[in-house]
Structure formats: C-alpha cells, structure tokens
Amino acid sequence: MSNLLWKSLVVSPAVLGATLLVSSAAIAATNATTELSVTETVVPTELAQQPEIVAQAAPITEDTKVIDQVNRYSNEGKGNAQSQVTSVSQFSDVQPTDWAFQALQSLVERYGCIAGYPNGTYRGNRALTRYEFAAGLNACLDRVNELIATATADLVTKQDLATLQRLQEEFSAELATLRGRVDALEARTAELEANQFSTTTKLVGEAIFAVTDAFGENTGDANNTVFQNRVRLGLQTSFTGRDVLTTRLAAGNATGFDFRDNNNNSIGASGQGLQTFQVGSTGNNNVEIDRLTYEAPFGPAQVYLAASGGRHSHYAAVNNPYFFDKTDGGNGALSTFSSENPIYRIGGGAGIAFNVPFGQGGSILRPSSFTVGYLASDANNPGPNQGLFNGDYAALGQLNFSVGDRLALAATYVHGYHGASGSALFDSGANGAIVGTSLANNNSFLNASSSNSYGLSAAFRPSDKLSVSGFVSYSDVTGFGANDDREVWSYGIGVALPDFGKRGNVLGIFAGAQPYARGVQAGANEVPYQVEGFYKYRVSDNISITPGVIWVTNPGQNSNADDAIIGTLRTTFTF
C-alpha cells in the first residue's frame, strides 16, 4: 500500500503538468469546444495560489505590495472556477501574443494614446493584467474621442473604430470597474482639495546685531560706540489659507543718540538720526507683545484689524521699495526717515482698515485701490479722554495708482487728534518721536491739538537694476491754546540699485529734510537735512550685512549745532 502511495506522489506532478499543458492549449485554441472536468479546472487554481502562500512567508517589501495589489485587481470579477473557459475575456492576464494586445499596441503606436514611458513606446513584450490592459484601452478611447471632437475624425479609420468597439465589448466589465474607481477617486480628491487646509502657525523671525556710533564735536563727545540688538519673533497663524493672524514678540536694548548743540546742551527728544532697529526698544531686552493684528479678505477688499501695535504702513502702500522693510525691519534703510514717508508715523495702536481695489479693467491706472484706516493710541484705556474714540487717534485715507508695472503713485490724507499729554506728532502711537525735530513733534502738555496732513509718494523703476522713490508731506497742526499752531514740512528722494555686485545686494542713497516746523521759535528755522548711504550685502538667503553712514545737519533746526555723522554696521538674521 505504501509503495503504491509513494509511486502516486512521484507520478502526480507529471500528471498535473501534463493536465495544465493540455488545458492551456485547449483554451488558446480559437474554436476549442471541449469541456473541462471539475478536477481539471480546480487544479490550475490551486497551483496559482501556491506562490501567494510562499510570498506571504517572505519579508514584505514595496515590490511585494505592488504585486499583491496587481493580483487583487486580476482576481476581481472572476466567475465560477468550474465554468467553461473558452473566451479571452476570462484570462487573468493578456499576453503579448493575444490579438487584443496586438490590436491595442497598434492603436497606441498610431494615435500616441499612451506616453508613460520615456521613449514613448508601449513595450509590447510584457504581459498585462486585464485591469492594466483596460486602463490602456480607456486612454485610447479618450484619445480617439478627442480627435473626433476636434474635427480631425478623418485621422481615425473605420477599421480602428471597429477594433476599438470590439475591444470595448471584450473588456466592458474592466472598463466599468476602472471608471467607477476613477469617479470615486475624483470625488475624494475634490473633497480633500476643498477641505485640505488646516489651521497652521508659522514662525517668522528677525534678529539684528548692530555696532554704531555718532561723531561730531559735542555730539560725538556725548556718545560712545555701542553694540545693540533687537529680536522679533512673529507667529503667523492662518485659518483659511487666505488670512493671517500675527502675534509678534519683541525684545531689544537699542536707543538713539543724544544730539548736542555747540553749548553742549541736549537738543531734546527728537527722531533725528534714529535708526530702524532702535524702534521698539524694550529696555534691557524685556520680552513684549508689540504687534497683534489680523488680516483677511472681505469680498474684493482686504481687511486689517489691529488689537495692539497697529501701524498705518502695515496696510497702506508706502511706495518706497528697497528702503522700506516691513515697518522698521532689518533689511531696508538704516534710518527711520529714509524708510517711509513720515505721514505714516502719525498715530498708531488699535483699529481697523480696508483696502478696496478699483479700476481692474483696461485702464492705464491699474491696479488701483482706495485705502481707509483708523488707529487709536489708547484704545484699551477706559479713563477720561481716552478709549477708542475719545483719546488720541489718526484716520487715514489714501488713493493708490499704478501706471503700468513701473510707476506707483499715492495721495494720502491723515487727520489726527492729540490730547493734552505732550505726545509726539510722529510717534506711531508709542508717545516717542520716531522721525522729525523736537519742534515738529512737540504737542502741548496743557492743550489738545488736531492735525491735518497731506502727502504724496511715488516709486519709479525704469529698469530692474534701478529704482527711484520719493515723498513730500505737509501737516497743519492747530492747537487749542495760544501759540500752539504750527506747520510741519518734510520731503525726500532715494535711489536704489538692486542686485548691485551680487544678486540680493542693494546699494541705496536717500536724502531729504526731516520733519521740521516753520516759524515757531526764533533762531530755530534751519532745515534739518539728512543724507544716508548704505550697502546691504547678502551673505545668504537668511543673513545680510549692511554698513552705512548717516549725515545729520542742523540738529534741532538749530544753526548753533554742528552736524553729526552716524556710522553703523548692521547684521540681520531672518528665518
């Protein structure tokens, strides 16, 4: 009995192999009608499953996952294993020798409906699963439909149309399955695209190291070489992908220089010679929240909402490229005067602003916009003569025009109210002068005042290597006490050479008159001119070094004060 069993086991593989060979030949025959027995159909199925069992024992790799997926696609849609196999539509694979494979290959070469390989060929020496074949067939169907839709149907022959129809009928089940899967994937993709954004917060930082000193007679003697710093860490949060909530932490120890007259008397609080990194000093590097703003689109308009630290130059077009950098940032001009028109320094704090575009058609003045904003310095204070509307405030209106892509213009009006607190006119809502002489800034400690300011600014780029910008502003300050009225003027022009010597470098020269008051004090009617030159050298995308010189004339509008020169070496790290 055991010998008989042993011999049966030895002979069985040969019998099975012969059976499989005969079965395959019978299936490949075109007119084959012989029915296979139950055992003949089950045996090939069992043999086909054996490699899968072996593969499961091997380590799972990416290639294995791909093969398993292909096998699953191949096994989908199969009928009963005991049914008759007489049609090519019931093969799990389509061989290169099959008529369907050769017909599709001919269509591919003729119409170029599959171009997935680098050389544009179809590589017809490899077997395909029925779903892979159906995918190629679907591509050819789409290509032929495209040719017909574009009135090039004469390129498609009747023979090719007949071949496509036969292939479509032969692989109708697979085509329907694939198209169903594609529709489902497209629906899921559309859903993901519509809801792909999630609330994210991005850190944007800037650190400034600066070595600076002031020279010139008494002013030079009263000041020493200093090493100052400022750090800003901005948390930018977006909820929709189109808005941004900015929460900025700042720390710094930089202060401005003490200007002296020829009698060695301090000229007084002013913004002359003040540098951008000296704005927002927190004493001994104490950390403060110096900006809390939210910006979002509202229909065609852009809305700016400031809870703290709002500035007009946050939302209004300044038109001073290469000199202005994110409101006293570390990659523009050295001085606050060269950075932006002083009119944007009137007021600041909390409030709201809108920027509404217009003239989007074929007008030469495009794109154009109208900007309005309101900022209150003491919006959080509920005390008398304080708050959002009863304290110091500044309301801005500005028309912005662009003539082509090379010229930008802006006309600005700012109305301000200044309480009897002795705050500076150009203080950005921080009570200390940012630009201008002390006479231009001083508001009465006894009486309130109002101001109406008018400004023009322009930026012109005749070429990518040259930028010219400038501004002029006039303020009519009306005090509510005797001799409190004054007129304040300021103007300036700058020339910048971007990419000078190297991509990312900037050579800039700016000259003009700091804000000064006319006819308010005898012997103090000189125009305080200022000239600045700097060269920003780009070390990398995140580091720049800027040496520069600032020449300040007639400090305090006083002819009895010698000129002063400020030398600075600024290093800026951005991340």
Curated annotation (Swiss-Prot):
Tell me if S-adenosyl-L-methionine is a UniProt keyword of this record: no
> Residues in domain SLH?
87-151
Does the entry feature the keyword Coiled coil, yes or no? Answer: yes
**Signal peptide bounds:** 1-28
- PROSITE patterns recorded for this chain? SLH (PS51272)
Enumerate the Pfam families for this protein. Answer: OprB, SLH
* Annotated GO CC locations: membrane
Domain of life per record = Bacteria
What are the UniProt keywords, alphabetically? Coiled coil, Signal
A biological process from GO = carbohydrate transport
Q: Which GO terms describe its molecular function?
A: porin activity
Q: Point out the coiled-coil segments of this chain.
A: 158-196
Q: Which family does it belong to?
A: Belongs to the OprB family.
Q: What is this protein called?
A: Uncharacterized protein alr4550
What's the source species for this entry?
Nostoc sp. (strain PCC 7120 / SAG 25.82 / UTEX 2576)
